[in-house]
Amino acid sequence: QGCPRILKQCKQDSECPGECICMAHGFCTI
């Protein structure tokens, strides 16, 4: 399903929707 284009703050990958991962800047991205 990929990574939804939603700016979502995170501390770990499991907080991110779809296949997004939590990046160093603290937001979910592809």
UniProtKB/Swiss-Prot annotation:
The record, for InterPro entries, names: Prot_inh_squash (IPR000737), Proteinase_amylase_inhib_sf (IPR011052)
* One GO CC annotation: extracellular region
Q: Where is this site: Reactive bond?
A: R5, I6
Q: Which UniProt keywords apply?
A: Disulfide bond, Knottin, Protease inhibitor, Secreted, Serine protease inhibitor
Gene Ontology MF terms in the entry: serine-type endopeptidase inhibitor activity
Q: List the disulfide bonds.
A: C3-C20, C10-C22, C16-C28
**Pfam entry (one):** Squash
Query: What CDD domains would the database entry show?
Result: PlantTI
* Location of the protein in the cell: Secreted
- Could you say which residues form the signal peptide? none
Q: Read off the SUPFAM superfamilies from this record.
A: Plant inhibitors of proteinases and amylases (SSF57027)
Q: Where does this chain mainly localize?
A: secreted
Tell me the Gene3D superfamilies matching this sequence: 4.10.75.20
Purpose of the protein:
Inhibits trypsin; probably participates in a plant defense mechanism.
Domain remarks: The presence of a 'disulfide through disulfide knot' structurally defines this protein as a knottin.
Family statement: Belongs to the protease inhibitor I7 (squash-type serine protease inhibitor) family.
Protein name (database record): Trypsin inhibitor 4
Protein's organism: Momordica charantia
